Design a protein with these regions (language model features):
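Hydrophobic "anchor" residues on beta-strands that sit immediately upstream
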Residues: 15-18, 98, 135
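Walker A (P-loop) phosphate-binding motif
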Residues: 8-35
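NTP-dependent small-molecule kinase module
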Residues: 2-9, 34, 150-227
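Conserved nucleotide-binding/hydrolysis micro-motifs of P-loop NTPases
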Residues: 51-53, 105-106, 140-146, 203-204
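Hydrophobic residues at beta-strand termini and immediately following loops
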Residues: 47, 138, 198
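ATP-dependent small-molecule kinase phosphotransfer cores
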Residues: 40-130
């Protein structure tokens, strides 16, 4: 299946999304891009994975009681994404603005499949998604990403560590297994969906320059078409 199966980008705005394993630095890069675009005078909107108020309370309660199965977890995230698509993503795109998304459908494709969901089924669930202008994949080697997360957090959460899958009782070991499976899914999606790979081991400034160059190419192309 290719990305042409998804909603074609028929809106005047631009949608740039970042993806990657935990600890890849994607959120840092998106925040820098957001600040820069605002400073350049662009109308910019931001949307973050799993942030819809529609499902926040349900998600919190279910996580606390460890009630999620891989399928229910997947469907709740899809509900969150559908709400944000209609509320936070499509309206700005219709108005010609720039939307930056911290994680997009590829997060579901990677995490849900890593948890054992059927690959084709997960892709079918998100067929309504708008095709992004560019999907950046910040790729960090597994050991680098793991070290960044483990060294910066006192304790890994149950679902974050993949402990619900019962691969092992050790949180750090489980997290490593989980993130390894996620990275495998991202790597296979590069060709499938045309993800733009950024080397997340480079200096932050160099990654940002590369990201801005790609974004500006699309914005300048839009300006030329308008002229």
């Amino acid at each position: 299946m290719t990305m042409t199966a998804y909603g074609q980008h028929r809106f005047p705005g631009k949608l740039f999304v970042v993806e990657g394993t935990d600890g890849s630095g994607k959120s840092t890069q998106l925040a820098l891009l957001y600040q820069w675009l605002k400073a350049e005078g662009h109308h910019v909107f931001f949307s973050e994975w799993n942030s819809s108020p529609l499902v926040k309370a349900t998600t919190r309660r279910a996580k606390k009681k460890h009630l999620f199965t891989p399928t229910t977890f997947s469907l709740l995230h899809a509900t969150d994404f559908a709400d944000r698509t209609e509320r936070d993503i499509i309206p700005p795109l219709k108005a010609g603005a720039i939307v930056l998304a911290d994680r997009y459908i590829y997060t579901a494709f990677a995490r849900d499949v890593a948890r054992g969901c059927d690959r084709a089924w997960v892709r079918e669930v998100y067929r309504f998604a708008v095709r992004p202008t560019v999907a950046f994949f910040f790729r960090a080697p597994l050991d680098v990403a793991i070290d960044r997360i483990v060294s910066g957090r006192p304790q890994l959460k149950h679902y974050e560590a993949g402990l619900d899958m019962q691969w092992t009782d050790d949180p750090e070991e489980s997290f490593t297994i989980f993130q390894g499976k996620i990275l495998e899914e991202y790597d296979r999606m590069v060709a499938e969906f045309g993800l733009t790979v950024i080397d997340a081991t480079r200096k932050i400034e160099r990654q940002q320059r590369e990201m801005r160059k790609i974004v500006m190419r699309h914005l300048e192309g839009e300006a030329e078409e308008a002229a």
